[in-house]
Regions:
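Secreted glycan hydrolases and related glycan-binding modules that recognize and/or cleave
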Residues: 1-230
Length: 230
């Protein structure tokens, strides 16, 4: 994403269709250029939204002055990875830093791409990621911003989803399931596994789900090409 550059809209949000609901700004953690800020403002004026998006296995990923070295992150955010309470407090600080960035640049929220384990997404300390998400939700509610989670498709990835509490699942605006190459039967099996993971909130989770697809790479793409030929 480069923003508006002359007459070209190739790398601009405003080059997207007017019907676009929202866009996740992959690997954007602030420091927007003048061109990006102008593009974002015009994009939002059309009724569309844009949210920050990155992977964060560890507390402080991408927002820690000095880089992503473990020792640097632990020192800056003030936590011991073996001490649960210090991790919870640091996760809340990290969430507030994301909120501050969204407010500074008038970004519409945060899309948490959940694909990595670490000091933030920790299966042995589920209170940490859930405190992080709860803080984001509470702060975003004050300004009408969005909270989204990306989770890879495939039953083997659902351990990330299972770490999220039912309260966290219900608090999300959207869940984007990255099911790029699954065919019809694979999707059926996957969402049956989703149901088993959090049966009490399955209906609500499905109501806020975005299911990704790459038809060109899907295992059953031949069904579509055969229909086109007939």
């Amino acid at each position: 994403w480069a923003g508006k550059g002359g007459s070209s809209m190739q790398y601009a949000l405003c080059g997207l269709p007017d019907s676009t609901d929202f866009v996740s700004l992959w690997l954007c953690w602030g420091n927007l250029t003048v061109e990006q800020q102008a593009d974002l403002k015009d994009f939002q004026a059309k009724g569309s939204r844009a949210v920050l998006c990155w992977r964060a296995g560890d507390i402080g990923d991408n927002l820690t002055p000095g880089g992503n070295d473990d020792a640097v992150k632990e020192a800056f955010w003030g936590f011991d990875p073996k001490d649960e309470q210090s991790c919870i407090e640091a996760a809340k600080k990290y969430a507030l830093a994301i909120v501050d960035t969204c407010n500074k640049y008038n970004i519409d929220g945060f899309d948490y791409d959940i694909e990595d384990w670490g000091t933030l997404m920790n299966s042995s300390m589920p209170s940490v990621p859930n405190a992080f998400m709860k803080t984001l939700r509470e702060e975003f509610d004050k300004t009408g911003k969005m909270l989204v989670a990306d989770i890879p498709g495939g039953a083997g990835w659902l351990s990330f989803y299972e770490v999220l509490s039912e309260e966290t699942v219900l608090s999300l605006d959207y869940i984007a399931w990255q099911t790029y190459e699954l065919g019809h039967s694979g999707l059926d099996s996957f969402f049956e596994a989703v149901r088993r993971s959090h049966p009490n909130v399955f209906k609500e989770a499905m109501g806020k789900s975005i299911v990704t697809a790459t038809f060109e790479r899907a295992v059953d793409k031949h069904y579509f090409t055969e229909q086109q030929r007939s």
